[in-house]
Amino acid sequence: MAVSKEDVLEFISGLSVLELSELVKEFEEKFGVSAQPVAVAGGAVAAVEAVEEKTEFDVIIVDSGDKKINVIKEIRAITGLGLKEAKDAAEQTPSTIKEGISKADAEAFKAQLEAAGAKVEVK
C-alpha cells in the first residue's frame, strides 16, 4: 500500500516544532537543498512600494515638564513665536509646535524639545 500525500501531511501536522526542524535539516542534507526563503518577485516588490510612507509630520508637545522656561526658549527658537505665544504653547498642552515638516526636521525638533525637558510626540 502506497502512502498518499494526505497521509504524509497528517503525519507532519502531528510533529512538534523541534521534530519539524530536524526533519527539515534531514531533507536539506538528503536532497542537497536549502530551506531559505525564495527572493520576492518584481511584482510583489512593486506592491510593497505602493504603500506610501508618510512624508509630513507634526511635532506636538504633550507635557512641558518641570523646566518650562527652557521649553519656552526652544519653542521660540523653533517657531519664531513671541514670548506670550510660546508660553501659551508650553502651558496649554498638548499643543502642535510645527506641522507638515519632514521627518528629519521633526526628529531634530523633538530632540531639542526633549533636551529642554518637554515630552514630545511626532505624528
UniProtKB/Swiss-Prot annotation:
Q: What GO biological process terms are annotated to this protein in UniProt?
A: translation
| Organism, as annotated | Aliarcobacter butzleri (strain RM4018) (Arcobacter butzleri)
Classification via Pfam families: Ribosomal_L12, Ribosomal_L12_N
What does the sequence similarity comment in the record state about its family?
Answer: Belongs to the bacterial ribosomal protein bL12 family.
Q: Which GO terms describe its cellular component?
A: cytosolic large ribosomal subunit
Q: Which gene name belongs to this protein?
A: rplL
What protein does this entry describe?
Answer: Large ribosomal subunit protein bL12
Check the record and name the SUPFAM superfamilies matching this protein: ClpS-like, Ribosomal protein L7/12, oligomerisation (N-terminal) domain
Record keywords: Ribonucleoprotein, Ribosomal protein
Example GO molecular function: mRNA binding
Alphabetical list of NCBIfam families matching this protein: L12
